[in-house]
Amino acid sequence: MGTQALQGFLFLLFLPLLQPRGASAGSLHSPGLSECFQVNGADYRGHQNRTGPRGAGRPCLFWDQTQQHSYSSASDPHGRWGLGAHNFCRNPDGDVQPWCYVAETEEGIYWRYCDIPSCHMPGYLGCFVDSGAPPALSGPSGTSTKLTVQVCLRFCRMKGYQLAGVEAGYACFCGSESDLARGRLAPATDCDQICFGHPGQLCGGDGRLGVYEVSVGSCQGNWTAPQGVIYSPDFPDEYGPDRNCSWALGPPGAALELTFRLFELADPRDRLELRDAASGSLLRAFDGARPPPSGPLRLGTAALLLTFRSDARGHAQGFALTYRGLQDAAEDPEAPEGSAQTPAAPLDGANVSCSPRPGAPPAAIGARVFSTVTAVSVLLLLLLGLLRPLRRRSCLLAPGKGPPALGASRGPRRSWAVWYQQPRGVALPCSPGDPQAEGSAAGYRPLSASSQSSLRSLISAL
């Protein structure tokens, strides 16, 4: 690309700007407020040590005292998952959000998710009430059994909308700022349903929309705000093969500072280049074999062009980087006050579809990801041989923490049966292969699908 083309690209007109809102959970306008840059909070390294914010909820156990469970500081000797001699919430197994153990033994509910207000990736605006009349987001909508966050973002980006909302695990809605102006925030824990197309992502809840800015995971953009966040294409899904994406970066100031919050490329053929926008000269290049520095990276240019290319086989989590403009190349690295992100949200030029389609599963980070799909299959197998001492009662399963394994109910992946008969019920451990097992639960209603959306709603439905 020639110098004139680079200059022209830098100064492309950009779409109307999204204004910051105090209600936003993790807006791209305020990246400094977020402690997480992955959609499931696997990168959370904060200090919340209770399941609720500001002292609410149950206290977490110390990770160096949980050897009886599947995850402890002993299982993370290199600190890859952030475990250690502390009791802060973490996500060592790639679950949908950080969690912690709350009980010494695996009797009853021995772990819980953590509600961490500061752990929402920039670009996620929060959980909103959707009563349906009128809808929380008034633009086009669709459903998909393979819905992921990025599938919905791509759909709404293609339609020309600023915001995308995921609901009930399978529904996607598009909208604009005016919709959120009359919207009503819901508790973050209300958006607790797993995306049908990705076991490691949450897609809203029953009557609850998880709302995102569509610029998240965009393949191109023109970024001129004093500071902000740029994600790899298709984020929070993995980037796909043969991606060729560019972002023009020109915040006010004489120099730039970049900090990579996440960087995971598949191999040396997947490459991110940083070029001076005026001259086109290559300043730095990173790939799967040559990652960027862990700390801030300063560049003596006021305008930058980032280009990412993946090969025909490329699939990995990608990258998330924060940037800020510096008034002087020697400026001390201190975040400016009151800065705001002003992303452009142009339509992706490639890999877009008129209807939601499946995204790729997230890449394994160390040993933390255990397939939820496999776990569900194991649980279904266990269901066939569960206890049947109580006639005409139903058994519903909720996963424990640990690698999937068949065997006794006290195994590392134990399951829990909810035996209930209206109007009351009780949670009991399932013991596969019980000789008293008997037939189906004729005459007793099953829990509704919405009541099975998470461990929390499953137990609270009793």
Swiss-Prot record:
Residues 35-119 form the Kringle domain. Keywords: Disulfide bond, Glycoprotein, Kringle, Membrane, Signal, Transmembrane, Transmembrane helix, Wnt signaling pathway. It holds the Pfam family WSC. Disulfide bonds join 36-119, 60-100, 89-114, 219-245. Residues 219-326 form the CUB domain. Residues 328-352 are annotated as: Disordered. Residues 121-215 form the WSC domain. Residues 388-462 are cytoplasmic. Glycans are attached at residues 49, 222, 244, 351. Residues 1-25 form the signal peptide. Gene3D superfamilies: Plasminogen Kringle 4, Spermadhesin, CUB domain. The chain crosses the membrane at residues 365-387. One of its GO terms (molecular function) is transmembrane signaling receptor activity. It is found in: Membrane. The keyword Glycosyltransferase does not apply. GO terms for cellular component: early endosome membrane; plasma membrane. GO terms for biological process: limb development; negative regulation of ossification; signal transduction; Wnt signaling pathway. Interacts with ERLEC1. Forms a ternary complex with DKK1 and LRP6. Binding to ERLEC1 is mediated by the oligosaccharides linked to the kringle domain. Receptor for Dickkopf proteins. Cooperates with DKK1/2 to inhibit Wnt/beta-catenin signaling by promoting the endocytosis of Wnt receptors LRP5 and LRP6. Plays a role in limb development; attenuates Wnt signaling in the developing limb to allow normal limb patterning and can also negatively regulate bone formation. This is Kremen protein 2. It comes from Homo sapiens (Human).
